[in-house]
Amino acid sequence: MNLGVSMLRILFLLDVGGAQVLATGKTPGAEIDFKYALIGTAVGVAISAGFLALKICMIRRHLFDDDSSDLKSTPGGLSDTIPLKKRAPRRNHNFSKRDAQVIEL
């Protein structure tokens, strides 16, 4: 019983459940100012879009980084020379034989 009384005392001290009376006669409901709601939503969307753009750029940079695939660290105790991987040249799939003939002319 003592726990219940102390909980009620805490709730009353925090002003939970109290009736609010305004001098204007309006009900004290939660009024939402849509201007600030739209501003907050726009800021949240802008931050999210910026974060997504940053992550996409980081992933693209990591995928197309030529130096990261060619460089390897030397493990301890092994020789100092490690053969580097050679990359195959990229093919241009949009290039056709007809284009080659046009270029030769």
Curated annotation (Swiss-Prot):
One Pfam family of this chain: DUF4514
InterPro entries cross-referenced by the UniProt entry: DUF4514
- Membrane topology per the record? Single-pass type I membrane protein
Q: Which UniProt keywords apply?
A: Membrane, Signal, Transmembrane, Transmembrane helix
Please state the span of the N-terminal signal peptide per the UniProt entry: 1-19
Q: Where are the transmembrane segments?
A: 39-59
Instruction: List GO terms (cellular component aspect).
Output: membrane
Spans within the Extracellular topological domain: 20-38
Give the primary localization class. Answer: membrane
Q: Where in the cell is it found?
A: Membrane
The record places the following residue ranges in the Cytoplasmic compartment, namely 60-105
Name the source's superkingdom.
Eukaryota
Protein name (record): Transmembrane protein 273
Q: Which organism is it from?
A: Homo sapiens
Gene symbol of the encoding locus:
TMEM273
